[in-house]
Amino acid sequence: MEELAHPYVPRDLNLPGYVPISMSMSSIVSIYLGSSLLVVSLVWLLFGRKKAKLDKLLMCWWTFTGLTHVILEGYFVFSPEFFKDNTSAYLAEVWKEYSKGDSRYVGRDSAVVSVEGITAVIVGPASLLAIYAIAKEKSYSYVLQLAISVCQLYGCLVYFITAILEGDNFATNSFYYYSYYIGANCWWVLIPSLISFRCWKKICAAAAIANNNVETKTKKKTR
């Protein structure tokens, strides 16, 4: 039986049993954005006036990124043959579509699978823990957010650098390259960078106050 041609680059990428995408790009993107907006809106409304606006924005971000890591990326990691799916399962369709921007996903590139695996299993749950930490004003909130953000930035660096080292030629065309490979990932560079900077300042300020308190107590004891 002749194998169906796939739309990915390189054209000779071996995908035995490949089943073409059945959903349109607009449907896939609309469902993702719509469901994300719904969940984020619920988080925003749930905390209402209980939290400052910035805290609510952070909780919305951690909800969005945490669920994306656990559900979307988790599916990719544990479904190595998603390209064979013939049931029109939404998550399989997402990765068939996204692979037009980076065929390393459908080709199961070891670097991509490793980064996504760590992200789905560790960073995702940690992101959801950050929601609780902010809501309950836990002392570890800033340290946790900084650690997660640094992990996300590191993952993005590995993701982009390995692509460059391998030739950076994994997109079907420039549209998918800039909309999926660049556009969909740039938020995980920009937002974690801003959060890291803020958390670093907060941690340094707290450390300075703690040091001042220690110095004050020491001076009182020596008098």
Curated annotation (Swiss-Prot):
Membrane-crossing residue ranges in chain numbering: 28-48, 58-78, 115-135, 175-195
Q: Has the keyword Isomerase been applied to this entry?
A: yes
Q: Which reaction does it catalyse?
A: lathosterol = 5alpha-cholest-8-en-3beta-ol
Pathway of action:
Steroid biosynthesis; sterol biosynthesis
Q: Which domain of life is it from?
A: Eukaryota
Membrane topology label: Multi-pass membrane protein
One Pfam family from the record: EBP
Judged by the first EC level, this protein's enzyme class is isomerase
Query: GO: which molecular function terms?
Result: C-8 sterol isomerase activity; cholestenol delta-isomerase activity
Q: Where in the cell is it found?
A: Endoplasmic reticulum membrane
Q: Does the keyword Membrane apply?
A: yes
Q: Which InterPro entries match?
A: EBP, EXPERA
Q: Quick one: a GO biological-process term for this protein? A: sterol biosynthetic process
Annotated EXPERA domain ranges read 54-196
Q: What Enzyme Commission number(s) apply to this enzyme?
A: 5.3.3.5
**Any one cellular-component term (Gene Ontology):** endoplasmic reticulum membrane
Q: Which UniProt keywords apply?
A: Endoplasmic reticulum, Isomerase, Lipid biosynthesis, Lipid metabolism, Membrane, Steroid biosynthesis, Steroid metabolism, Sterol biosynthesis, Sterol metabolism, Transmembrane, Transmembrane helix
Q: Which PANTHER family does this UniProt record tie to the protein?
A: 3-BETA-HYDROXYSTEROID-DELTA(8),DELTA(7)-ISOMERASE (PTHR14207:SF0), STEROL ISOMERASE (PTHR14207)
Q: Function of this protein?
A: Catalyzes the conversion of Delta(8)-sterols to their corresponding Delta(7)-isomers.
Return the similarity comment.
Belongs to the EBP family.
Provide the protein name.
Probable 3-beta-hydroxysteroid-Delta(8),Delta(7)-isomerase
